[in-house]
Each structure stands twice: as C-alpha cells, then as structure tokens.
UniProtKB/Swiss-Prot annotation:
Acetyl-CoA carboxylase is a heterohexamer composed of biotin carboxyl carrier protein (AccB), biotin carboxylase (AccC) and two subunits each of ACCase subunit alpha (AccA) and ACCase subunit beta (AccD). It comes from Chlamydia pneumoniae. Component of the acetyl coenzyme A carboxylase (ACC) complex. First, biotin carboxylase catalyzes the carboxylation of biotin on its carrier protein (BCCP) and then the CO(2) group is transferred by the carboxyltransferase to acetyl-CoA to form malonyl-CoA. Signal peptide: none annotated. It comes from the Bacteria. Its EC number is 2.1.3.15. It is found in: Cytoplasm. This is Acetyl-coenzyme A carboxylase carboxyl transferase subunit alpha. It catalyses: N(6)-carboxybiotinyl-L-lysyl-[protein] + acetyl-CoA = N(6)-biotinyl-L-lysyl-[protein] + malonyl-CoA. GO terms for cellular component: acetyl-CoA carboxylase complex.
Length: 324
C-alpha cells in the first residue's frame, strides 16, 4: 500500500510491534501486558495524527490509490448488479458505471463515476472524467429508474468533467446543464454519496437529489486545490493554502447547507477498512430510502427544489461583525 507522509510514523510503529510479536514466539522479550501497552500507545498515536489533519492531507487521503471506487462499492454492498451501458446517442462512457442493483433486498438503480485502479484501467476510464455521453448515460439510467419506480443512488468520484476538444464539440456544457435540469425534477427518490473527489461540474452533473452525503475525507468543490492555486497565485506550491480556503470537506459543506450528512470513515481513511465503509454507506442509503419512499412525488420534488434553491447564502465578515 502506498504511504502518505503522515502515515509513515504509524506504519513504523506497527512494524515494530509486529516484530516484537514474532520474536516473542521464540524468546519472551516482552510480556503480553507490555505488548498491549505498546498497542494502546499506537492507538493514541493514530488518534493524535488523524484528528489533526490539514485539509490538504485529507485531500491526499481522498486520492489514495487504494481508496475504494465505485466498482468496489458495487461488489462490497450490493447483492446483485445488472450493468447497463451506452447513452443511445453516441457511445458508452467507461467513466460511468451503472445498472440495476439490490441492496438489502431493495432494488435501486445505481450510477457511479469510476476512475480505475491501475494505469490500463485509468486510461480506459479516462481517470473518471466524464464526456458528454457519460452524463447522457447517467440521465438515461435515471429516467429508466423513474419509469420503473425505482430509487436512484449516485456515487460521485471525479476530478471533473473531461475538458478536451472532442468533449466540447459534443456539447459538454449542454450535457451537464441538461442533467441539472432533468435530475432536479426526476420523479423518484434520488440519493447521492460523494465517495472520493467531487470536483466542479463533473460532480454536480450527477449530484442533484433529495439527500446528499459525503464520506469524511471526500471533498466537494468548484475546483481542485491545484486549479485554485494556479489561478489565484500562479503557484502550485500553494495547494495546501487553497485547500484550506475552499472549505471543501463535509463539516464545512454541511454547515453551508450544501450536503446533509457526513459518513464516518475508519481511522486513516476508507482504504484502511473498506468493509466498514461499505457497511456505513449501505446503512445510509437504506436509511434515506426508508425516509423518502413514502413521500408523495409532488412533495418530494418540492423539497428537492427548495433544498437547492436555498444553496448560495453566504456570510461576509467586516470590522463590525458578520453581515448576511
């Protein structure tokens, strides 16, 4: 597993404890109580490190190569999966994976952005950057869910929509705008979970729904820290400062009313205990479906409309205090 800078001390401590345990099998160097003390110290070290992460360190956790992706969530929390492909206009976009799933016996249409896990799959998936046909594919599956009366789950994980010339020629901006319009009035419950990066229009084009959640170390922002740093300061070394200023993590966005729920991750991030994360996300999806399923469609759409209309309130600070 690739190590992040803040993880090195923890891993060294874990290796030392493992070595002591191995040597103890031959010679009793430490008693079991002494090893337990070392393990308690390790737990305290983890708590100290991971409770004081900077926003930029959390972005690094979010981008960890071993972080679970959409295909992992499908495998880890769904009993069944029937994949559907294509946008019925141009081609299939591998950056979007979707189809019929069953979660705890309930059928959903699940649609997720997929980055890939190695060089070959990342190239195939275009690093999770959707083309217009990806947004059309997502909308097609959403409309199919509406037709059959099934709730929709979106899993968001993208560095942004693909900015290439071919995507622009095929109407990238229009495809995103069309999704915003159509998803805002999709007549079925829509649940969104940001499982990794949620960057710019690439994320927003699949994130209009009735309940929006984020994993603890995921981020959701108008731009990446690198993009912000390059525009504001023309200096890529300002990534950390940009990450702090953007207020891109769950606790900030919940306060702003942009998301509804922050889903806890294991200490160190989702890649340290994927099974626990699958369980937490599954529990959230079922809980929200139970809350939304009995609402009349008119009420559901009205609440969704009001939810997104209320986004955009802000506060400025002057010498005399906060101003609305």
């Amino acid at each position: 597993m690739e190590l992040l800078p803040h993880e090195k001390q923890v891993v060294e401590y874990e290796k030392a404890i493992a070595e002591f345990k191995e040597k103890n099998k031959k010679n009793s160097l430490l008693s079991s109580s002494e090893i337990q003390k070392l393990e308690k110290r390790l737990d305290k070290l983890k708590e100290k490190i991971y409770s004081d992460l900077t926003p930029w360190e959390r972005v690094q956790i979010c981008r960890h190569p071993s972080r679970p992706r959409t295909v992992n969530y499908i495998e880890g929390m769904c009993e069944e999966f029937v994949e559907l492909c294509g946008d019925r206009t141009f081609r299939d976009d591998p950056a979007v994976v979707g189809g019929f799933v069953k979660i705890q016996g309930q059928r959903f249409v699940l649609i997720g952005q997929e980055k890939g896990c190695d060089t070959a799959s990342r190239l195939h998936r275009n690093f999770g950057m959707l083309c217009p046909e990806g947004f059309r594919k997502a909308l097609r599956l959403g409309k199919l869910a509406e037709k059959f009366g099934l709730p929709v789950v979106f899993l968001v994980d993208t560095p942004g929509a693909y900015p290439g010339l071919t995507a622009e020629e095929r109407g990238q901006g229009w495809a995103i705008a069309k999704n915003l319009f159509e998803l805002s009035r999709l007549a079925t419950p829509v649940i969104i979970v940001v499982i990794g990066e949620g960057c710019s229009g690439g994320a927003l084009g699949m994130a209009v729904g009735d309940s929006v959640a984020m994993l603890e170390h995921s981020y959701y922002s108008v731009i990446s820290p690198e993009g912000c740093a390059s525009i504001l300061w023309k200096d890529p070394k300002k990534n950390s400062e940009a990450a702090s200023m953007l207020k891109m993590h769950g606790e900030n966005l919940k306060q702003f009313g942009i998301i509804d729920t922050v889903i806890k991750e294991p200490i160190g991030g989702a890649h340290h205990d994927p099974a626990l994360v699958y369980s937490n996300v599954r529990e959230f999806i079922i809980q929200e479906w139970l809350r939304l399923k009995d609402l009349a469609i008119e009420e559901l759409l009205e609440k969704r409309y009001e939810k997104f209309r209320s986004i955009g309130l802000y506060e400025t600070t002057s010498e005399s205090g906060p101003e609305a």
